[in-house]
Amino acid sequence: MSSSPAILPVTNQQAATQSQPPINSHAFRTFLSRLSSSLRESLSQRRPWLELVDRSSFARPDSLTDSFSRIRKNLAYFKVNYSAIVSLVLAFSLLSHPFSLLVLLSLLGSWMFLYLFRSSDQPLVLFGRSFSDRETLLGLVLTTIVVVFMTSVGSLLTSALTIGIAIVCLHGAFRVPDDLFLDEQEPANAGLLSFIGNSAATSAAASVVAGRV
């Protein structure tokens, strides 16, 4: 009497794939945590707004060199306040153009959920076709170029940033720095500027990108 053949275990690849989360939740939570802590640190280092608009501290600069010197010193002292002003101008411009805001949010969401925070072992499947990480990156880069340079989004962002920077430079040129500006020594990387300059290298999102390329 012959024995029945042994039954080999079979893994359901489709079920295993479906059980995996669509995004790397740990990297996403780490990114949000770093963003939140950086914003809190930035807000804690902002200068009093009344000091920013103190009318007694405004005077016309004597020369162009004096203007640049004032701008440099005021940027070092009011950097968080200036960042907030530029952000407010940018936010107001986007809110006044809902379509551009929707397009920009859609583009940002595509980068976050289709590439940056998508699980590395979770392939991107669209229209019945599986895309590699390099193909996904190339598609997102091309889409970003089209959206920024061939729609109203790019011109809107450029005009908003230009207005914000012009306001900052105008204030910095006419705001007379006092001794507090010259005596105060601050770290080169702090608050919001630190997050902008360094978080990309230290956040979990950067680790995910490095692992994909």
Swiss-Prot record:
Keywords: Endosome, Membrane, Transmembrane, Transmembrane helix, Transport. GO terms for cellular component: endoplasmic reticulum; endosome; endosome membrane; Golgi apparatus; Golgi trans cisterna; trans-Golgi network. This is PRA1 family protein B2. Residues 1-21 are annotated as: Disordered. GO terms for biological process: vesicle-mediated transport. InterPro entries: Prenylated_rab_accept_PRA1 (IPR004895). May be involved in both secretory and endocytic intracellular trafficking in the endosomal/prevacuolar compartments. It is a multi-pass membrane protein. It is found in: Endosome membrane. Belongs to the PRA1 family. Its main location: membrane.
